[in-house]
Amino acid sequence: MDKTIKYVGIDIQGRRVYQGESGRLYCNTVTFGNRPPHYCTKLNNDFDGEPDLDMPQNWNPTVMDDNDTDKNTI
């Protein structure tokens, strides 16, 4: 499981997509509201693929935001 993920864009369904140190793609399936993020892997590691496996609720990666300068833990 990756400990750091980097924001890489938004998929065709409006989900934020991240890439881990291993190259694995993840998405946040919470696209609105004030709820905590819910991460899943991407099916076949495809940027626009469907969410696949749920990440454990206690998985708390360091997220590099879209400008690559700030690190935030969520």
Regions found by a protein language model. Name each.
Residues 1-74:
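Cysteine-centric segments in proteins
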